[in-house]
Regions:
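Active-site lining segments of carbohydrate-active enzymes
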Residues: 1-9
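Catalytic-loop motifs flanking and including active-site residues across diverse enzymes
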Residues: 14-17, 80-81, 144, 148-152, ...
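Long alpha-helical scaffolds in large eukaryotic adaptor/regulatory proteins
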Residues: 25, 29-36, 156-159, 163, ...
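Catalytic cores of carbohydrate-active enzymes
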Residues: 7, 17-121, 125-127, 170, ...
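Terminal, non-catalytic domain-edge segments
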Residues: 206-225
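C-terminal substrate/ligand-recognition segments
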Residues: 119-164, 213-217
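Feature representing long, continuous alpha-helical segments
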Residues: 98, 102, 146-154, 166, ...
Length: 225
């Protein structure tokens, strides 16, 4: 078969996860006196990974490329770059994180989640309707995903701290009505990427519910700081 959304080579969120894992294990080992040498080695690898990450993915417009495969650069603005600004360990500095978050705010954010691709990108298809094949081609090409917004809002809170609380709270309001429209107390799988942002797919999606609960916990944490 053919992939609906082909992505090959160096993929931005895979490399973000790799850096995060290297740093996490390095700090974990640093607490063990007998593993300090391995901890230092992993920290060194992470440092090289961070430099390579920035050289590979950060473009002159201030956001991250989705993937790089040899000479093929995918300039699509996708939410996959947000993980690099939301994880505990990031290969980006504060200015670089802000660039990705600002792009996501302008191009991807909706009242019902984060779009899977920017409307200005080729192949944008915001409506999850029609037969299976048609819906498959819309799945990651413009529909909005609440679970991805959880990572976006976490990145926003990391950047702006307490000053971000009111913004995050306003984003959460968009889900209140949805909890009584489809499955009581739950959020549907995804939403159309354009107004009126109609809920689609499964009537209850655990990843979305979990991210909303996690975001509410993050709000409480920052509110108490």
């Amino acid at each position: 078969g053919r992939p609906v959304t082909p992505r090959s080579g160096d993929i931005v969120e895979f490399n973000t996860l790799w850096y995060n894992a290297l740093m996490y294990v390095s700090e974990l080992l640093a607490e063990n006196e007998g593993a300090s040498e391995l901890s230092s080695r992993l920290a060194g690898i992470a440092e090289k990974t961070a430099k390579s990450f920035v050289d590979t993915f950060l473009n002159e417009y201030g956001y991250l490329l989705d993937y790089v495969d040899g000479d093929m650069l995918d300039w699509s603005v996708r939410p996959n770059m947000i993980f690099a600004a939301s994880f505990d360990y990031s290969p980006l500095d504060a200015k670089q994180k802000k660039g990705s978050v600002d792009f996501a705010t302008r191009e991807l954010l909706t009242p019902k989640g984060v779009r899977s691709v920017c409307p200005k990108s080729g192949g944008y298809n915001p409506n999850y309707v029609g037969p299976q094949l048609q819906r498959d081609y819309a799945y990651h090409q413009g529909t909005a995903w609440p679970w991805l917004e959880g990572f976006y809002l976490e990145a926003y809170l990391r950047l702006y701290k307490r000053s971000a609380i009111s913004f995050v709270e306003r984003q959460m309001i968009g889900y209140e009505d949805e909890m009584s429209l489809h499955c009581l107390g739950a959020i549907p799988e995804l939403f159309d990427g354009n107004p009126p942002f109609k809920g689609r797919g499964a009537v209850s999606f655990a990843m979305n519910v979990a991210q909303i609960l996690r975001t509410l916990n993050l709000l409480e944490k920052y509110d108490n700081q």
